[in-house]
Each structure stands twice: as C-alpha cells, then as structure tokens.
A protein has these predicted regions:
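Short beta-strand-centered segments that line the small-molecule binding cleft or hinge
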Residues: 8-12, 29-66, 70, 133, ...
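A late-sequence structural motif
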Residues: 5, 156-191
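N-terminal winged-helix
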Residues: 1-17, 21-25, 30-33
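Flexible hinge/capping segments at coil-to-helix
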Residues: 55-92
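Residues at or immediately flanking beta-strands
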Residues: 19-23, 115-119, 168-170
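A generic structural signal for short hydrophobic patches within well-formed alpha-helices
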Residues: 2, 74-75, 128, 146
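Hydrophobic hinge/microswitch elements
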Residues: 28-41, 47, 100-158
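Secondary-structure junction motif
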Residues: 76-77, 91-112, 179-183, 187
Length: 191
C-alpha cells in the first residue's frame, strides 16, 4: 500500500503541512485492523482481502492486479500461458502466515485443487521481489510495482490460465473515534 499509493500522497501532504508529525507502522492487514480496533492508530491503509465490522469502515482507494513473476532461471515458463498445476513443484516465495495476502493465495490454490506452501516466507511484500530476482523461487507481486523490473529484464511475468483475484488498497477508519484536524486533513490527501 505504501509504494502503490501512499508515498505520493504523503509527499503532497508534507509539502502542505510540513510541521505535522507522521508515524507510520508496517503492519499486515490483520495487524492494522486490530491496531485500529484497539485505538492504537488513527486509520489504516491496507490491502484486500479484508474482513471488518462496524464501527470500522472501509473505502476503496485503488484497484490493482497481482501477477506471478519469476527470475531468469525460470524465464522459459513465460513463453506461453501456464496452469497453476504445472507450477506446483517449483519453489514459491510468499508472505508469511497471518497475512491476508497469504490467506488469499491459500484459498486461490485450494479452489484450483493445488496445495500452497511457500518454500521461502517473507515478512513484507517488499522482500518478495528481490528473492525472485535472485532465483530463489517464483511468486506473486503487484503488477504496477513489478512493471519496472519486468521492463529491465530482471523478472518475467508468467501468464496463468487460472485468473487471479482482483486486489484493492483500502482506507479503514474507526467511526467510534473522534479524529483530529491533522488526521482529517491527512485522510483528505489520501482519498
């Protein structure tokens, strides 16, 4: 979420309000939602899938697609569409358990009757791509962020026969809290 949407908006906010202090946390979606429920954060920017109940509210900020990418070791797989079944014996790089992304891919693989157990588990999405570039496995990555390294020939996009779920970046707020003026202004810049 940070690199997909938030950095540009925070840059503009900082130019307009240079004296407002910001504190960012790097939580998984479930951790961010829990922090919001516990009043530990003012709002959360998270990726779907997400499960929330009132008093939490979500607003979609950006739709995006993830793609399956590989390093040079597996680039021959990028020459034609492949089924997820054909890839089950390859090493996968994925996010650790306890993330909504991991849960989403567990469900995706289960729906396609394939087991999913990443060989390497990363704590954050930003850790996934360097491991793929260095041929430690194949993995899913947000297409807008992968495009530059695809264009540079560092990774290769695999075309899957089974469509991947659409993802969203969402703003989540807690309607049971009173927001400060600074928080309201920050949200205005984000949405």
């Amino acid at each position: 979420a940070l690199r997909l949407i938030l950095l540009e908006k925070l840059e503009r906010f900082r130019e307009e309000y240079p004296h407002v202090r910001l504190r960012l946390f790097n939580h998984s979606t479930p951790q961010a939602v829990q922090a919001l429920k516990n009043y530990a954060v003012d709002f959360a920017i998270v990726t779907t899938p997400i499960s929330i109940r009132k008093p939490l509210q979500k607003k979609s900020l950006l739709n995006y697609q993830e793609i399956l990418v590989c390093g040079s070791k597996y680039k021959d797989l990028a020459s034609s569409p492949v089924s997820i079944h054909e890839l089950q014996d390859l090493p996968f790089v994925g996010l650790a358990e306890g993330t909504s992304t991991r849960e989403m891919y567990m469900n995706y693989f289960m729906e396609n009757h394939v087991s999913f157990q990443p060989d390497i588990e990363a704590a954050t999405t930003d850790q996934v791509l360097p491991m793929i570039v260095h041929n430690l496995g194949i993995g899913f990555y947000p297409e807008p962020l992968a495009q530059e390294v695809i264009d540079d020939g560092k990774v290769f996009a695999l075309q899957l026969k089974e469509p991947l779920p659409q993802r969203e970046v969402c703003l989540v707020t807690n309607s049971s809290t009173t927001m400060s003026t600074a928080v309201k202004k920050a949200i205005e810049f984000i949405v």
